[in-house]
């Protein structure tokens, strides 16, 4: 199966909101929720994509040859590549009923684990979303990261218990989901967390905790203060607030602020190719998350579709490393890109 075939297959079954575009840039779906769009006009999602495209790579083939080593270590686990599938929940609402959260996560989590990476899984107002995600992670031997929404503390405790029961190697919370309307309308309301509240949640995890949705140096420092083992520089794929900067724009300053602290820096938002992955690593990220294209891969080809997309990313990353003189991820440096 080729990647164009995956996209073509997805268009037949992914539903009316997502167009399975050849380039997933947020233009066709920009203001569609339900769907992969945004609650506003969607300009942040489009900016995410545009800013990665503006960054250029500095080719330099006057170097020793060899096959690049793309392995990355994260929380004591070794992964074949420095990219991970991002979290999504309620796929039958935002995409189509060709998959439920159970069948989607079964395919995604297993395929990612079998191909050397891990999947972050989603959450939702329907309790079965987290239940199904954590069951899939448990079936994959804990190779996955349950991502909990910033609910009220009682709900978080329930979700955290499910996450820990899966044997997952880390837990995440997408704090930027505070901008989703359905969270604000809850009783008691869910949403933003203080450093003190976040610290309590970190302790509940009893394993590395990842704070997803950091867009400022101040926010990164707050996450560190609360005890986070990693952050994800993220604006929720541009879904929760218009007029935000792109993740590529803020990544360098956030990575610099956390350098040497032991807190890992991941990034998402508009990253679509192995070249984009290279750019993110050059700007200071330890790894990246990619969400929407993995949804397309599942709908377009199941486990084979996921493998096809992973192989595509891996090939592009390795080729870019070779053409820029990087033999390992540690050798990818800021001077290898032009911002």
PLM regions: where:
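An N-cap/entry alpha-helix motif that binds or orients negatively charged groups
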Residues: 2-80, 332
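N-terminal binding-site loop/beta-alpha segment at the start of enzyme catalytic domains
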Residues: 90-98
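A gly/proline- and charged-residue-enriched helix-loop-helix capping module
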Residues: 103-152
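Short glycine-enriched loops at secondary-structure junctions
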Residues: 90-91, 123-128, 176
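Alpha/beta enzyme core
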Residues: 99, 109-110, 138-139, 151-267, ...
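Outer membrane beta-barrel
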Residues: 80-89
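Conserved active-site-proximal phosphate/metal-binding subdomains
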Residues: 1-30, 219, 238-261, 271-339
């Amino acid at each position: 199966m080729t990647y164009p075939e995956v996209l073509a297959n997805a268009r037949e079954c992914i539903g009316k909101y997502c167009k399975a575009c050849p380039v997933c840039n947020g233009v066709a779906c920009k203001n569609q929720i339900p769907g992969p769009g945004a609650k506003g006009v969607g300009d942040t999602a489009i900016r995410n994509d545009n800013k990665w495209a503006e960054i250029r790579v500095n080719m330099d083939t006057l170097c020793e040859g060899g096959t690049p080593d793309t392995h990355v270590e994260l929380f004591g686990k070794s992964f074949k590549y420095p990219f991970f599938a991002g979290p999504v929940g309620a796929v039958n609402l935002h995409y189509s009923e060709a998959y439920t959260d159970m069948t989607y996560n079964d395919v995604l989590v297993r395929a990612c684990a079998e191909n050397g990476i891990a999947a972050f899984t989603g959450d939702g107002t329907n309790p079965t979303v987290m239940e199904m995600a954590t069951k899939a992670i448990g079936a994959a031997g804990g190779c996955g990261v349950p991502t909990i929404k910033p609910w009220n503390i009682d709900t978080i405790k329930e979700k955290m218990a499910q996450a820990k029961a899966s044997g997952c190697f880390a837990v995440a919370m997408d704090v930027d989901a505070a901008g989703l309307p359905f969270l604000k309308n809850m009783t008691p309301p869910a949403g933003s967390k203080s450093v003190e509240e976040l610290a309590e949640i970190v302790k509940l995890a009893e394993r590395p905790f990842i704070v997803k949705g950091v867009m400022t140096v101040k926010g990164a420092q707050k996450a560190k203060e609360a005890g986070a083992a990693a952050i994800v520089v993220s604006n929720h794929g541009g879904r929760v607030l218009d007029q935000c900067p792109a993740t590529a724009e803020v990544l360098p300053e956030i990575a610099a602020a956390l350098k040497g602290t032991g807190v890992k820096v991941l990034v998402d938002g508009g990253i679509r190719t192995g070249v984009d992955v290279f750019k993110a690593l050059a700007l200071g990220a330890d790894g990246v998350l990619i969400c929407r294209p993995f949804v397309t891969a599942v709908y377009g080809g199941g486990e084979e579709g996921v493998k096809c997309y992973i192989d595509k990313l891996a090939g592009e990353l390795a080729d870019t490393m070779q053409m820029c003189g990087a033999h390992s991820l540690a050798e990818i440096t800021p001077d290898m890109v032009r911002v």
